[in-house]
Amino acid sequence: DVYTANVPDMSPTRDGSLEHVVRNMRLLDLAEDGSRLRLWYSAAFSADDNRPWYPQWIFDECTKKFGPPVPTGQIANDYRIMNDCNLEMWRQAGKWQSDCLNYMIKEHGVEVIFSHYHLVDMSGHTYMNVMKERYDSRYTEEEIYQCAIGTYKACDEYIGEFLHLLDEGWTILLFSDHGLVSRNEDFDPLIGDNYGVNAGVMCELGYTVMKKDKYQQDT
């Protein structure tokens, strides 16, 4: 049961050529006789594509020093993947990202950083709906709660990579784009939730109306 980072691989591109990529992997289960195994592997990230970077020399310099960009993503409904794979992958990504940013500050005099770390959002989508025990729950609330604890510990580790900058006169501002809550129902309401349509906006645009109760309040 070892998490293995930056496993090299090849992936086909749209033009039919092959691209160098990296994945993260973890062997979750292995039968004693070798007859069966359960292996998790992440999505593939390009190890060579510098097009999203500007100026592009930053990509070349950072990857030479800290390795390739870290694959990230989300898989839900499996406790070991959520807790032992997704979370470990995001922890690895946070360290890589913070190493690159601190390097640019120290070596190239960067004075302003806008850092987006998608861990809390992506992890929340994997476990938020199952934080409340339901008729089809595969895990207890306490087990899923530990996923949330792990998420915020990893986020704290990421923020901690920059706290030394406070002693150098930097100001650190933390923002969240939105919140996620565990639904009360045993089904997705679809309208007004984070996976469906925001009813308020649709009402304002005149594309939908809400049912009313006897007091003429939206239901």
Predicted segments with their positions:
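Conserved acidic
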Residues: M89, A93, I144-C147, T151, ...
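Metal-dependent active-site segment of extracytoplasmic phospho-/sulfohydrolases and closely related
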Residues: G150-G196
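Extended hydrophobic/aromatic segments used for targeting, binding, or gating
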Residues: H125-L165
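His/Asp/Glu-rich, glycine-adjacent segments
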Residues: D1-R138
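Short secondary-structure boundary/capping segments
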Residues: M128-R134, F187-V201
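Generic, well-ordered alpha-helical scaffold segments in large soluble proteins
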Residues: C100, M104, H116, T151-A154, ...
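Substrate-binding rim/cap in mid-to-C-terminal beta-strand-loop elements of soluble/periplasmic
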Residues: G160, D193-T219
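A general structural signal for short secondary-structure junctions and capping/turn motifs
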Residues: L28-A31, N102-E107, H164-L165, I172, ...
